[in-house]
């Protein structure tokens, strides 16, 4: 079998599982008693193990196997989570992640896992407690229990709980056919089936042994389910090479019989302790069964195919505009009707095509909780990260680029924003700092805000550093507004941290953030209150492939200016232009703003505004700077499809790309940021 | 006998040039070209080739020949080399022929004023005509364009 065909699927799914492991471990860390989370973690680890073993990545499989052993003890209440176990599990995840990344890079996924495996083994055997000097008494005494078909006290109570809540409990004996070649695989298929229909409480032999084909011709399981016996039976028997499934419905009486051979209860308080997790498990089970039907079906698609689809669609869009023009000229009602209908359909199609490329910001956000946890630990600060609006969607191309700037800003907030614990207590703030990461839609933009309740930005200190580093002069500094001073943080070569740490504060970073966001067509802003905290906000365009633009004319040539940076349009008279210190300015809404001659900048062959007595101007904005751009004529507003100019022509000044107009002609898109110095 | 090469033959200022067929994507009639400001004079601008924006070069200008108005016979040859896609404006494109790769000689030092590095070699078509094989990589070399730009400034 050609494994390469499955490799990309394996990588995708491994990444998903690693992500879910990370998330759930974090959740578990804040609620260590919640065994339902352990179940989820266990299942992810288990699937990962199976997948890597199938693909022949032995080290991955053996590491996940050890993790699974630890988790198995935890979920069966034989081991309590503590700091050491969490750290070891997180470390294991890091190792797993680097192994998967190695495979992505074409490597073999091999890594030295002996250290981490040893720690995990120590946890399983209970030895680590002596090293870690944890106070809790060892609870691993039940390890030595003989394994048989009998259920342990915990499993019995789970089964009892389920019966009380109206679930059915079956004992199923599955027999595979004598000539069956892939016993383990068939058994796995049966388990898959059973886990979809309910919860497998106990299997004999154990799942691990079954997977290693350590069983003869039959195995038995205890299953909790809603489904009727007959349906399950046929489903199991429909799995190929399965000979029979013998099912027995258990009631409380037979259950108590089953529990007889098990050992006497170790302590009187055990049942009480067991009840709660059992009830929790039940909850999980029912909710799992309900959501199982509602999960939307998805497929993974190569992003390149979506790009092709987008290209094809934009050609269609251009033809549509052309058809509309022609229909307008021909004036035949049935033609007009058809074209109108086509316009509606293509409008819907445009929505769908654009939506296909939209990805929830979650895919970027979900790596932050882990990062914040590690960062806070390194810095010895207490930080809670609150994420809202993770479902907000952004174009895939923006998502790919936005990760690094956000990491920079978050690191900055935690390193420089949130104060050390003592300082917080002195200021009368709660011990742990809060960082809010918010994403939301507004109009054609998506906003991402990072808000911390830290010390805020000290205007004087920022200004002093900026003056020292020659970013501004002392005179300039005096007349600057608070926000202007804060924006100095984004100036190249700026750092206010007195102590340089490896987290941030190398003086690179924030200016990189601004450059990146600007290149995505977005903008950065800062609000801050000394002693209260700081908000960094990033404004991003919804999509990079279709934008709204104002079409303008310069003589015979047509250009597009992105609507996002246009404030308004106006008409000025020649005599309104002032010549100030060699540059042309106009007075606009009480401010003096520069006026830019587009025809001169673009070396227009057949338009010169100096011949006109009245000139149309477009007022554009970059951050808080404004400028008026003189044009010949406004054509109107239109949705345009962005096209790259091609490698041969990159770096043409003031032009950010091209688009194709309704008449099939190419129009260049003006980059407004290049017009404002 | 060497390898058989399929070559597209086009004319430029009374000379015959050849480009291997596998480098050529399509040959188009003249179409509206949108000027791109602040580019060397031989870059005519960009065209819309079925939804893709492609830059167009006047080959006469590129080789320092006198630039003329487009005629009924003028064609745009779209070539693809490395990851560049560029259109060449030529006087006419008339033929696809097979030539023997052994028949291509290294170019003499000076050929019709065009510097030898743009040429891969010269092949004899028949008694009268010579076919000049283009070296696409050099024609599309951007480093030289940057030098040209500096010269203009």
Predicted regions mapped to residue ranges:
Chain B
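An acidic, low-aromatic, low-complexity terminal/linker signal
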Residues: 1-153
């Amino acid at each position: 079998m050609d494994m390469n065909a499955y490799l990309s699927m394996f990588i995708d799914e491994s990444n998903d599982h690693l992500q879910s492991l990370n998330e759930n471990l974090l959740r578990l860390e804040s609620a260590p008693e919640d065994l339902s989370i352990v179940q989820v973690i266990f299942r992810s680890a288990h699937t990962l193990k199976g997948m890597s073993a199938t693909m022949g990545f032995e080290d991955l499989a053996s590491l996940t196997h050890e993790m699974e052993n630890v988790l198995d003890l935890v979920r069966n209440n034989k081991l309590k989570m503590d700091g050491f176990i969490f750290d070891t599990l997180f470390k294991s995840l890091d190792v797993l992640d680097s192994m998967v990344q190695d495979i992505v890079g074409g490597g073999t996924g091999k890594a030295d896992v002996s250290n981490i495996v040893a720690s995990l083994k120590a946890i399983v055997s209970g030895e680590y407690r002596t090293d870690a000097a944890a106070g809790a008494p060892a609870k691993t005494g039940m390890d030595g229990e003989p394994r048989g078909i009998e259920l342990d006290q915990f499993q019995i109570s789970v089964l009892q709980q389920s019966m009380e809540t109206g679930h059915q409990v079956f004992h199923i004996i599955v027999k595979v056919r004598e000539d069956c070649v892939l016993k383990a695989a068939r058994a796995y298929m049966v388990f898959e089936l059973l886990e979809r229909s309910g919860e497998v409480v106990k299997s004999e032999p154990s799942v691990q042994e079954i997977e290693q084909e350590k069983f003869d011709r039959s195995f038995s399981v205890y299953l909790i389910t809603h489904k009727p016996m007959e349906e399950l039976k046929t489903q199991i028997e429909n799995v190929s090479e399965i000979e029979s499934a013998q099912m027995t419905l258990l009631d409380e009486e037979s259950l108590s019989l089953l529990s007889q051979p098990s050992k006497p209860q170790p302590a009187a308080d055990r049942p009480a302790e067991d009840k709660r997790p059992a009830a929790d498990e039940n909850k999980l089970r029912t909710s799992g069964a309900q959501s199982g039907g509602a999960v939307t079906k998805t497929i993974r698609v190569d992003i390149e195919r979506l790009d092709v689809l987008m290209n094809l669609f934009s050609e269609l869009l251009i033809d549509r505009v052309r058809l509309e023009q022609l229909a307008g000229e021909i004036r035949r009602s049935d033609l007009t009707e058809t074209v109108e209908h086509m316009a509606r359909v293509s409008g819907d199609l445009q929505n769908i095509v654009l939506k296909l490329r939209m990805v929830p910001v979650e895919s970027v956000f979900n790596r932050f909780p882990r990062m914040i946890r590690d960062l806070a630990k390194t810095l010895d600060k207490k930080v809670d990260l609150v994420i809202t609006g993770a479902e907000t969607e952004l174009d895939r191309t923006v998502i790919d680029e936005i990760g690094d700037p956000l990491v920079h800003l978050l690191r900055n907030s935690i390193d420089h924003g949130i104060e050390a614990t003592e300082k917080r207590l002195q200021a009368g703030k709660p011990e742990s700092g809060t960082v809010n990461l918010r994403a939301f839609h507004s109009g054609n933009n998506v906003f991402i805000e990072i808000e911390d309740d830290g010390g805020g930005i000290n205007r004087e200190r920022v200004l002093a550093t900026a003056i020292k580093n020659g970013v501004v002069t002392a005179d300039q500094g005096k007349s600057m507004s608070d926000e202007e001073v804060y924006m100095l943080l984004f100036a190249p070569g700026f750092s206010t941290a007195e102590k340089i740490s490896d987290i941030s504060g190398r003086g690179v970073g924030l200016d990189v953030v601004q450059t990146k966001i600007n290149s995505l067509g977005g903008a950065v802003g800062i609000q801050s209150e000394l002693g209260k905290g700081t908000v960094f906000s990033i404004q991003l365009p919804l999509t990079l492939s279709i934008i709204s633009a104002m079409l303008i004319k310069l003589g015979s040539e047509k250009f597009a200016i992105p609507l996002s940076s246009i404030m308004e349009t106006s008409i000025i008279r020649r005599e309104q232009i002032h010549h100030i210190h060699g540059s042309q300015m106009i007075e606009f809404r009480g401010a003096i703003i520069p006026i830019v001659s587009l025809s001169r900048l673009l070396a227009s062959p057949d338009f010169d505004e100096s011949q006109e007595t009245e000139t149309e101007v477009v007022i554009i904005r970059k951050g808080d700077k404004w400028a008026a751009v003189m044009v010949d004529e406004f054509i109107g507003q239109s949705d345009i499809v962005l096209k790259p100019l091609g490698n041969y022509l990159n770096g043409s000044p003031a032009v950010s790309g091209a688009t194709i107009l309704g008449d099939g002609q190419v129009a260049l898109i003006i980059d407004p940021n290049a017009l404002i110095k | 006998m060497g390898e058989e090469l399929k070559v597209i033959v086009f004319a430029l200022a009374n000379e015959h040039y050849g480009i291997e067929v596998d480098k050529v994507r399509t040959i188009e009639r003249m179409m509206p070209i949108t000027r791109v400001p602040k580019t060397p004079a031989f870059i005519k601008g960009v065209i819309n080739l079925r939804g893709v924006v492609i830059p167009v070069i006047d080959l006469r200008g590129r080789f320092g020949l006198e630039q003329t108005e487009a005629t009924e016979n003028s064609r745009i040859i779209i070539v693809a080399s490395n990851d560049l896609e560029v259109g060449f404006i030529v006087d006419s494109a008339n033929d696809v022929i097979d030539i023997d790769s052994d028949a291509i000689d290294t170019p003499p030092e000076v050929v019709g004023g065009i510097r030898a590095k743009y040429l891969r070699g010269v092949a004899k078509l028949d008694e009268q005509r010579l076919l000049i094989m283009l070296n696409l990589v050099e024609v599309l070399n951007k480093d030289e364009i940057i030098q040209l730009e500096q010269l203009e400034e």
